[in-house]
Amino acid sequence: IGNQRTRLLCCEEMTFPNDSGYKRFYSPLFSARLCTNMALYALSKFDAPERLTVGIYDPDAQCTDLVSFVLKYTGNVCIITDNEDVFYDELNTIAEETGACAVVTHHREQLSNCDLVIAPFEIEENLPVRNDAVILTNGRPKENIKGFVYFRYCFKMPNGFALLRPEGLSEEYFCSALYTLGSQYELGSIVPDLCRN
């Protein structure tokens, strides 16, 4: 096992002693892609997405590329981040290329104006969203959040990979390992069939 001892592919129920040095593989990157792909697909299906106000909640500025895709559907975009400078750089490039712009702030209360909130990574704090807002995220939020929160994504795994999946591993977990450890980045283009909570 060697240097892979902290990235073992195993079912969720399997536990290791704390002092063993062994850890179950985990990466949020593939699930974040499912979340953003679902959000973009949903925006593409709205009759008038330009009427929506979309919030992107990305405190660590890990999904700056998402902004340009969301701006194709609506000009009402508010980015909530603790790393505003990273988004300013991205938005300057977008403004030069397309003329589009978005609001960037660290003030969470701006989310109260949003119809849709895209949070590609797990939400670890209570967010001031409306009761009727739709929130797409990655993993169950650590705090109770108002609105319609969706964090589980159902999709069809490509056949070649489906045949390789060991019994006991979920499709999302196995694809996460293929995407992250196996560099199977084509899996990042999967659009979920549905999302649920």
Question: Whereabouts are the PLM-identified features?
Answer:
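Flexible, charged surface loops at secondary-structure boundaries
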Residues: 1-7, 19, 47-51, 70-73, ...
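Phosphate/diphosphate ligand-binding glycine-rich loop within oxidoreductases
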Residues: 2-34
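Structural motif
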Residues: 11-14, 56-60, 80-84, 118-123, ...
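Short, charged/polar "capping" segments at the starts of alpha-helices
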Residues: 15-19, 63-66, 84-91, 124-127, ...
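Short internal alpha-helix immediately C-terminal to a glycine-rich phosphate-binding loop
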Residues: 34-52
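Glycine-rich phosphate/diphosphate-binding loop of Rossmann-like nucleotide-binding domains
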Residues: 46-110
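Rossmann-like adenosine-cofactor binding region
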Residues: 103-162
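Adenosine-phosphate binding glycine-rich loop
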Residues: 136-197
